[in-house]
């Protein structure tokens, strides 16, 4: 990934995970004896099936995995769907399946009326190369038909409809279009398709004016192949709108005051009568008065000033936008709210529109409200709202403002916003910063007099006599379970990963301790499957991320993280939460290093590890923390690895000219600009100026576009200093920041397992294709040993 602001924004006792762990352990207890099992591998991680949420995201975000799914019920409640996705390493494909369940059969099994465990039927299965889901945006059209987006062994995504009773899914859109969003109302289909990106104007001239351009757009002006685009990059790709009526496209041109309508991260909502479409469209020019709206987290680079070109630039994923109303017959496009949508100011709530039955009113989420003399200016300029828009009267009625904090200090985020058209109830689900659990739920009911009342009523829930949920814990991937009021225990209904019963998974538990400053630290501790408390094991620290409610396969991310496959090699793995209390402060680097030291100390004190055999990996923003550790505490780690990350280095600073907020970020983290007297501060704080101090073998992986350039300073300095450094470069530079394609994941994650196995356990895989790799590493070991000998001679003298 290029240095973007998203990369820079990150947000001793064991205990048994209570209810979920208990019943999952019972469910898995029928597996074969341990002697018949084999260790967990990177391939197992890649090919594990996950029950995913197929709803298209309307949030500008970077996701490490697809969110966990839940049953999607048919309108008549007789069936429900689950969607699974897994990687197929041999084909380098993602495979997704839509599974159909009979609810009566499920209910009878959970109640004990039937001994037959329900077996779902696959009504659609697609696989394809690429970095985006093979199936997404799944929804019932009625109780017999399902619509969804899918890729059929092609990088292009089409709109399909499948009947649940017969036949194969049939495509509604052409095979050579990439459909990015859709909505269907009766015989009207609205969908958007990607506009093929073109090289920037003038970027391929013999002489190029570089003023105001960043080095990445200059060096990489040609668009990526569609199979190499990931969800993050799609956020900056424009889409065109199409309308089908009775299967034929209407000859309508959709234009705004700035030209042809182009949509980004489209959210489409057709009125029940098929006449109107609501979406969120970018603005070509910032309207007067929008400067008053406050960007979230004070990201002033996104301030909606009329002279802020970045606020409306295509490459800005948070570009300024607003809700608009489209007449699908005439093509007229008009603003629906004279205020910005919240997502353009980094308010990460779902951006949706829900029509009421009269086709005159619609609920709009995550939008700011216009500011006038009679309104509460502070609330309207700092918090987006949920409103009801009357398209005939062009009026807005607020329902509520979306909250960002929960006293005393809990940070809230909106997980989902749901509308029950039959119950006329709106539900807003909040999660907190302490984990993925729901922190708060708000419900609002539409009364007959068109007013809104906050209520505790439920919305669109499964029948009370049967409760279904998708659950997982650290040691078990997602499964479908059910419970009825007459039974206290949950019943395992369906496990999409029976193959893992023949794999030794080992144990992952929560682990917490305090550092020397009294800060509470926490992480997830993965132990080798044959863990012996009398043995002190090597340790690998994986910083950045902590989710105790999700199956632990890799760790926080897929790029470079070894996770459970590392533990299977006899190495303790600590997935360590990165505290952000010192983020963008001059002592951030030293604070994070103290965290690493405290983890090593506590694990050694508790008898888990050998403090002399510890490795660490850095990814994305935590590469800076790893480099800070090996330059300022050179004896702390036996080996280190960094992948596609932020170095907070002099060279990265210069490369970031005219590229977002990166330089400002580095100046705050170091405490000065790297010029004049400020360079002295960089000399002491930036890792790149202190590589002469390191003795730790370092592996650098450069997988994304521009990473060879960004990481060259690290490699060049260490190489010049004759330090033990190795660097691998993905020549195509076609990987996303968070790896998705099975082949790329295997390359990155298996190299992590190999690297730490070599340095911490002296192990080499007996694979002829890795001969050159181990030859290089043995040479690095010689360099390290010579360096240690030289240091010893100096100390003795």
Predicted features by range, described:
Residues 13-25:
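Bacterial N-terminal signal peptides
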